Amino acid sequence: MILNMLKGKIHRATVTQADLNYMGSITIDKTLIDAAGILENEKVQIVDNNNGARLETYVIPGKRDSGIICLNGAAARLVQPGDEIIIIAYAQIIESEAKTYKPKVVFVNDDNTIKEITNYEFNE
């Protein structure tokens, strides 16, 4: 059996820009996508903690260490600069591997610099 599992995520990033006139996608600081194991053009889910919106798009790498998180195209209507979002990538993993797989989780500061990188989430 193949399962859809969390591959990596960037947790509580702050949206820095929204560009309605761009073709689509999300531009993310290259340092952040590398840390989360997310690839250029990879499909991601965006969850907006401010308004509850959820959407899917693909990733465009932004300038390294710039802190850029920019929603492009129609997504700019759902997510605004200043909103706190979670960027989630999933992978299809066979069940035997899924039991031991550890996703990459990148926690960021308010300026989208990396605060912590873990390979799991622990919630007490």
Curated annotation (Swiss-Prot):
Molecular function in Gene Ontology: aspartate 1-decarboxylase activity
Cofactor: pyruvate
UniProt-listed SUPFAM superfamilies: ADC-like (SSF50692)
UniProt EC number: 4.1.1.11
Taxonomy, superkingdom: Bacteria
Active site: S25, Y58
Annotated catalysed reactions: L-aspartate + H(+) = beta-alanine + CO2
Keywords: Autocatalytic cleavage, Cytoplasm, Decarboxylase, Lyase, Pantothenate biosynthesis, Pyruvate, Schiff base, Zymogen
Pfam families assigned: Asp_decarbox
Compartment(s) of residence: Cytoplasm
Pathway in which this enzyme or protein is active: Cofactor biosynthesis; (R)-pantothenate biosynthesis; beta-alanine from L-aspartate: step 1/1
Keyword Manganese: no
Keyword Cell division: no
Summary of the function given for this chain in its UniProt record: Catalyzes the pyruvoyl-dependent decarboxylation of aspartate to produce beta-alanine.
Similarity-based family: Belongs to the PanD family.
Protein name per the record: Aspartate 1-decarboxylase
Gene transcribed to yield this protein: panD
